[in-house]
Swiss-Prot record:
Enzyme nomenclature, EC number: 3.1.13.-
A GO molecular-function annotation: RNA exonuclease activity, producing 5'-phosphomonoesters
GO cellular component: cytosol
Name of the protein in question: Ribonuclease T
InterPro entries (alphabetical): Exonuclease_RNaseT/DNA_pol3, RNase_T, RNaseH-like_sf, RNaseH_sf
Signal peptide range in chain numbering: none
Keyword Cytoplasm: no
Organism of provenance: Pseudomonas aeruginosa (strain ATCC 15692 / DSM 22644 / CIP 104116 / JCM 14847 / LMG 12228 / 1C / PRS 101 / PAO1)
Domain named Exonuclease: residues: 32-206
PANTHER family the record matches: DNA POLYMERASE III SUBUNIT EPSILON (PTHR30231), RIBONUCLEASE T (PTHR30231:SF2)
Residues that hold Mg(2+) 2 according to the record: D35, E37, H193, D198
Length: 224
């Protein structure tokens, strides 16, 4: 299915009257940055262990900024596979007494509720996932939505913005830490592979790239 066909089938509609600048910027889509930490690479069989989502706002001059972050540690679904190498890579300790993990459905319900509020505030019809190697995050998000049976998923099911690609274009770097450093951002490798930290850094990187493009005259609001 093409994106245009998906738009035709979408059951929401944009508000009448003047459109919010954010809605004009991305054709009615609201960028929401997502990062997941998992028990492996297979979204169908491997556990979702952490998820974070950062909504993106726009100031009065049309520049983007990271707005609000939602973060949850997740209880592995029943029968989930967890590779020891994945835990070693992320540093996640499933038996940590302060982990305070929740079920997938509870986490997604809360995140989606916040995203729907952001959609309404920005006059947007749908969220579009932003991620570093975004197909990975979108795959795990879609798998969790399917497992939980959640019907009101605000995200486009297959379109996304990939900051690995954008950073390769803008800075010649595709690794998140190196891309952030090339963009003049601080990046603490000790904090990396936490869904919250990686999401917030990816959001900062995405906003910086989009804002830099605007400053170069690459996008002008038709209503400016």
């Amino acid at each position: 299915m093409s994106e245009d066909n998906f738009d035709d089938e979408f059951d929401g509609s944009l508000p009448s009257g003047p459109r919010h600048p954010m809605a004009r910027r991305f054709r009615g889509y609201l960028p929401v940055v997502v990062d997941v930490e998992t028990g492996g690479f297979n979204s169908a069989t491997d556990a979702l262990l952490e998820i974070a989502a950062t909504t993106v706002g726009m100031d009065e001059k049309g520049f983007l900024f990271p707005e609000h972050t939602y973060f949850f540690r997740i209880e592995p679904f029943e029968g989930a596979n967890i590779e020891p190498a994945a835990l070693e890579f992320t540093g996640i300790k499933l038996d940590h007494p302060l982990r305070m993990a929740v079920q997938e459905e509870a986490a997604l319900t809360e995140i989606f509720r916040g995203i729907r509020k952001a959609l309404k505030a920005n006059g947007c019809k749908r969220a579009i996932l932003v991620g570093h190697n975004s197909s990975f995050d979108l795959g795990f998000l879609n798998a969790a939505v399917a497992r939980t049976g959640i019907k009101r998923n605000p995200f486009h099911p297959f379109s996304s913005f990939d900051t690995a690609t954008l950073a390769g274009l803008a800075y010649g770097q595709t690794v998140l830490a190196k891309a952030c450093q090339a963009a003049g951002m601080e990046f603490d490798n000790r904090e990396a592979h936490s869904a919250r930290y990686d999401t917030e850094k990816t959001a900062e990187l995405f906003c910086g790239i989009v804002n830099r493009w605007k400053e170069m005259g690459g996008w002008m609001d038709d209503d400016d």
